[in-house]
From Swiss-Prot:
Entry keyword Ribosomal protein: yes
UniProt keyword Cell division, yes or no: no
Protein name: Large ribosomal subunit protein bL28
GO cellular component, one term: ribosome
PANTHER family per record: 50S RIBOSOMAL PROTEIN L28, LARGE RIBOSOMAL SUBUNIT PROTEIN BL28A
Entry's transmembrane regions: none
Family label: Belongs to the bacterial ribosomal protein bL28 family.
GO biological process: translation
GO MF terms, alphabetically ordered: structural constituent of ribosome
Short name of one Pfam family: Ribosomal_L28
Keywords: Ribonucleoprotein, Ribosomal protein
SUPFAM superfamilies: L28p-like
Amino acid sequence: MANVCAICGKGVASGIQVSHSHIRTKRTWKPNLQRVHAIVNGTPTRISVCTRCLRSGKVQRAV
């Protein structure tokens, strides 16, 4: 799936952006995903992972 972290499942969030003149428009917030080579079930695969999972060490990177 696009725009979803393979580890924690973080995806796109939607909401309303409010300008200084209080004009409200719909917008989306996308997670900061990186395509990395990681070890999944003993085999190296390429997955999309958010940077929070990368920084916290939840991903075992393939060498």
